[in-house]
């Protein structure tokens, strides 16, 4: 068997079109002490990870007090009663069958981990020594210096593990005669140490208990900038070179409300997840995985991933079936739905009649009624014979949590559930958000849409705290078992793993609080998609024999770059694809102050010549009344270096033209 080889050194230097001094740039990495095996109970057996190797080992130290979780009161911050009560109820109901608790997931081994990573990032050809093809060159040309270093590190680990596997191992004397030590005695109950165990040492005390009573509380009213223009790993590398972490800032997150973050709107506007076409959106997860790996490398953390077990159960029904199977059945009724209809019905029932119910989500419903309702839904849901007005809110909330727990694949996915759980290991709050942001982008579309619907509902519950007595922290602790204890892993937990439960609750709390930020596509990722599309477009022109076209376009781009502002057109021609026969082209003056909202305003005035919108109107989408129904119009960027992108009303047309001179602008009626 031939030995797998890496790229030759000469070709490795071409991994990215960046002025690198070496094939694998040396990026400084933080040394962060972590609790080993902290989240092993989530289904991954102890093993190697994708993170950097040979890190210096440090003795365990408590997380600093300024990294404590956000709470609304000191007494509440120490309370995890909602979590333990929920776990106890799950145990009493015995929802998870014993035979279902087998080998659901296992952690990937070294070598296999890197091979899977390269495959998920679209760089699997590099591991086989096949050289750089067009797809690899296009992707690698978009990467930053820290991202290139992450790719090089995975290739190096893969090559070393492949060489070790091919060599015949030297037999150890213990392999022949065996060895016996008292440490190998199995526990009496035959269960390995995959539990939430109590931490008694003072070094591992809860950060809340070690926090100073007079900690920084002024952060509650602060609004910090969350920069998405540059890669998160590049930001972390800069902070590390500046003796990160610095005193104060987001690292000093004490008790009280979570600080607020603001995404600065650049000249190109903000891009939400739903703004990009499906073709462009498919390019985001590989880029996000490379960036997340690079960020964890800089922070000195291990990015743990698991292999998902194969689903052998039924693919029909409502409870205990995969999300994609649910959506396939739903599409027969509503072809455009993106969230399971059952979940929508449960959330709608709770929003109408349960938001003001005291203890909603925490107080259990009647188990007899819940079981009967589940059976009725399985039988009559699609026939529309379920009367939701008669469903008790507590029964509906119980059924909601049961629906999540019964998913054969966790909502946060088996592959990335350990990564979600390890987010609290990051000391800096802003960097935790960066990691969470990338993890959300890695979720499959059905999981991401379902999670978004759930988080929107949880935010509404927390907003009614005065009536339902459920704070954001209460809501988070109650929902942890349904999100972090997936099917196939019964909750054999002891009432001592408070820190571990707090960490999971913190993740849920952050996802609810910052969901608008998390469902934004970072500007640097959109820029990488543009570069990737541009590279693929130029290569396809050459492959199709359009050499003259490609050379002509190259010269045009070069001339435009040389002429600068003189080549910029004075008028923007915008196509109109809305259902309005009176207009098919709109001309708008193109100057540095022209924004998308001005285009929509001008378009509305053309449709209704006598109407003038009120000054100071906050509606940038120019709602128009037509046939007594409000009509919303949107502007899209189509073609060029982007497939399709819905434009932010505050985006500037001149900057959009410079970013994508070969694209077009189109006005369409909103699909909703």
Swiss-Prot record:
Listed GO MF terms: GTPase activator activity
Pfam families (alphabetical): RhoGAP, Ubiquitin_RHG40_C
Biological processes, Gene Ontology terms: signal transduction
Region (Disordered): 43-68
Domain (Rho-GAP) ranges: 321-519
Keyword rRNA processing applies: no
Domain of life: Eukaryota
Keyword Repeat: no
Keywords: GTPase activation
SMART domains: RhoGAP
Arginine finger (site feature) positions: 362
Compositionally skewed regions (Polar residues) per UniProt: 47-59
PROSITE patterns, A to Z: RHOGAP
Function: GTPase activator for the Rho-type GTPases by converting them to an inactive GDP-bound state.
Protein name: Rho GTPase-activating protein 40
Source organism: Mus musculus
């Amino acid at each position: 068997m031939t030995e797998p080889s890496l790229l030759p050194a000469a070709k490795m230097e071409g991994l990215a079109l960046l002025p690198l001094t070496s094939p694998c740039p040396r990026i400084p990495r933080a040394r962060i002490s972590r609790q080993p095996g902290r989240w092993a109970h989530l289904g991954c057996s102890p093993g190697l990870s994708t993170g950097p190797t040979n890190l210096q080992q440090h003795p365990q130290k408590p997380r600093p007090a300024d990294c404590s979780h956000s709470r609304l009161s000191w007494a509440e911050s120490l309370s995890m009663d909602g979590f333990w009560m929920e776990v106890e109820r799950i145990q009493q109901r015995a929802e998870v069958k014993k035979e279902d608790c087998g080998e659901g997931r296992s952690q990937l081994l070294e070598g296999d981990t890197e091979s899977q990573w390269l495959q998920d990032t679209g760089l699997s050809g590099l591991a086989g020594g096949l050289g750089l093809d067009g797809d690899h060159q296009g992707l690698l040309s978009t990467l930053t210096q820290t991202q290139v270093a992450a790719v090089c590190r995975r290739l190096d680990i893969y090559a070393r593990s492949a060489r070790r596997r091919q060599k015949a191992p030297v037999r150890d004397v213990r392999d022949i005669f065996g060895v016996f030590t008292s440490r190998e005695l199995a526990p009496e109950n035959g269960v390995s140490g995959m539990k939430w165990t109590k931490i008694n040492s003072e070094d591992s005390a809860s950060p809340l208990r070690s926090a100073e009573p007079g900690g920084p509380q002024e952060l509650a009213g602060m609004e910090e900038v969350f920069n998405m223009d540059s890669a998160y790993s590049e930001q972390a590398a800069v902070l590390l070179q500046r003796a990160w972490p610095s005193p104060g800032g987001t690292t000093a997150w004490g008790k009280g409300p979570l600080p607020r973050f603001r995404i600065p709107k650049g000249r190109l506007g903000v891009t939400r997840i739903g703004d990009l076409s499906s073709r462009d959106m498919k390019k985001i997860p590989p880029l996000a995985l490379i960036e997340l790996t690079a960020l964890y490398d800089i922070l000195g953390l291990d990015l743990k991933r698991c292999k998902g077990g194969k689903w052998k159960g039924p693919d029909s029904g409502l409870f205990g079936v995969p999300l994609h199977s649910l959506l396939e059945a739903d599409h027969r009724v509503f072809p455009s739905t993106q969230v399971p209809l059952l979940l929508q019905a449960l959330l709608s029932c709770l929003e109408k009649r349960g938001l003001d119910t005291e203890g909603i989500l925490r107080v259990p419903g009647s188990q007899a009624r819940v079981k009967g309702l589940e059976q009725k839904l399985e039988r009559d849901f699609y026939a529309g014979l379920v009367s939701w007005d008669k469903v008790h809110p507590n029964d509906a909330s119980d059924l909601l949590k049961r629906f999540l727990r019964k998913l054969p694949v966790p909502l946060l996915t088996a592959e990335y559930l350990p990564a979600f759980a390890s987010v609290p290991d990051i000391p800096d709050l802003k960097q935790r958000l960066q990691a969470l942001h990338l993890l959300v982008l890695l979720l499959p579309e059905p999981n991401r849409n379902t999670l978004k619907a759930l988080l929107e509902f949880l935010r509404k519950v927390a907003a009614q705290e005065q009536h339902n007595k459920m704070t954001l922290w209460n809501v988070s602790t109650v929902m942890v078992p349904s999100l972090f204890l997936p099917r196939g892993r019964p909750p054999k937990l002891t009432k001592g793993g408070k820190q571990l439960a707090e960490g999971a609750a913190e993740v849920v709390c952050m996802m609810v609080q910052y969901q608008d930020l998390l469902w934004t596509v970072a500007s640097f990722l959109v820029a990488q998609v543009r570069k990737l599309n541009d590279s693929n477009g130029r290569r396809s022109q050459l492959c199709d024999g359009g050499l003259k076209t490609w050379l002509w376009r190259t010269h045009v781009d070069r001339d435009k770059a040389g002429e600068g502002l003189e080549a910029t057109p004075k008028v923007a021609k915008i196509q109109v694809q809305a259902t309005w026969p009176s207009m098919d082209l709109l001309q708008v003056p193109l100057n540095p102050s022209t924004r998308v909202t001005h285009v929509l305003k001008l378009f509305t005035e053309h449709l209704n010549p006598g109407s003038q919108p009120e000054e100071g109107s906050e509606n940038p989408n120019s709602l128009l009344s037509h046939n007594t129904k409000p009509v919303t119009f949107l502007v899209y960027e189509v073609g060029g270096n982007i497939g399709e992108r819905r434009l932010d009303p505050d985006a500037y047309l001149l900057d959009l033209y410079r970013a994508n001179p070969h694209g077009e602008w189109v006005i369409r009626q909103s699909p909703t």
